[in-house]
């Protein structure tokens, strides 16, 4: 059905233009990759300016418009005061309002009625256990970003203004009504003149004015709270600015298109992932045209199974893709709800809607990997330090009372089913701890929680026994064993060595998990391990290996000597008894057993080596013959020869030290001649 634009008032559009001109600094979006420039011609000339969030300009703009602020403030404060009075009344009656499900529902409904900005606020609060009690967190996670649609004629008007031509000249078809309507815009299904099926997203009218006015009010209240409320642990102004920046990015459909292209470049080549294309000719600040993807929501399990698709496998694909987003490239989809993840007929997982994206800095990515490793190994002392590095705790925080609390919250995390103990339940359990201790949730982590909790919700619906942490750890183990970054090499060192002792069980655990990670390449790991061992970066491993070899060979030599000496003494004693005619009696003597603790340690080490060999044999791509060139490389390498020299020197030093010690003991045991003379006198 071809759309027919109707004449409408331009009051909403005029208000947007005034606000944009006065509030927002205009900047040109990043240029597209060269391939797109070649395909589309002078693309940079087609693009109008886009805009960014500037809080100072917003504050200055609305300070001069007190009547607008007052009108909106009244609309916000009356329902908000009713809610606060209800909380106060609950406290007067001796009830705890923070555990009231009715109050949580009331808050969700209040935020929905206040409009787009407060829907986004509620979604942001649903990932802030440092600010919101657990019952309220549960309810806010159900907050739906859905609003009634606005008239088609307004949408068609926006299309013409943004793209420079009436909708019927651009699209051969547009659905008679929107197929979805959210807080910031609505989506139509369409078809281009060239026949491609497309999704057309159009922004709501008067959106910028409403969003900026709400941001001004929230920011003003946050500034007042920062000045007046001394016990606030979180910076409400920074949280408001972070939220506003996200909303401004979502309102700019150019930015969403750029996000989609970047996501496709990073993850679109993965074999089971699909990312739709952007039609830049038909995209503007308030209109986005992208490829239409036919698929089934992951929550529609029966329909997926009817297509012969393994829904559980698709969730695993989503988990692995999310891990790459979070921990490999640091650019991730922060809103993977069921409507944005589709099962395609060919079994691939399609990602949609790139308005809410976020980035993680390298030190944060490495910190998260370290935290997961410490969590899995129940190393809560190190986990507490990770929270300091990840900005959850200030550097001067006393960690002693926090460590046992972490153990209580995370103690059984890895072994539990996702339905019993998952990211959301961990978040719920941490909420009480965050009220008790001075935790603060960084903005980047709030979006990670939102992303992973949403993905886990889908997993639970498909398979209640799906273990997200167990599925995630093989990837973590692979990264820890193969990543060449200095941060993860240090983490590997701390994980495998403690007080000079090698922790074989942790290496076994890493290899056992890493071999189950998709894309694990045994040849690559073997070559990387050899290269690392012989490089300058592997010095600490070589030092530990030399120490282990020296100790093991020394203990073996000492035990062998003790055993030989004991046997000789037994033989001499036996022969002496025979000469005295007491051989029979000697046979009845109990042979003294020399304590040999080092032998038990050697047997334990040998058992660990056997376990490692068994794990390697079970690894895809394993072949014992692959060790031959590696061993040859190690033998002829000068570094290996130096290790041999260090082992020999270490053994010699131990032998000399032992001789000196025995000589000193012998001197101490001999009587002093001077004392004998005095005693005789």
Swiss-Prot record:
Highest taxon above the source species: Bacteria
GO molecular function, one term: ATP binding
One matching Pfam family: ABC1
Cross-referenced InterPro entries: ABC1_dom, Kinase-like_dom_sf, Prot_kinase_dom, UbiB_kinase
PANTHER family to which the protein is assigned, alphabetical: CHAPERONE-ACTIVITY OF BC1 COMPLEX CABC1 -RELATED, UBIB DOMAIN CONTAINING KINASE
UniProt record similarity statement: Belongs to the protein kinase superfamily. ADCK protein kinase family.
Protein name per Swiss-Prot or TrEMBL: Uncharacterized protein sll0005
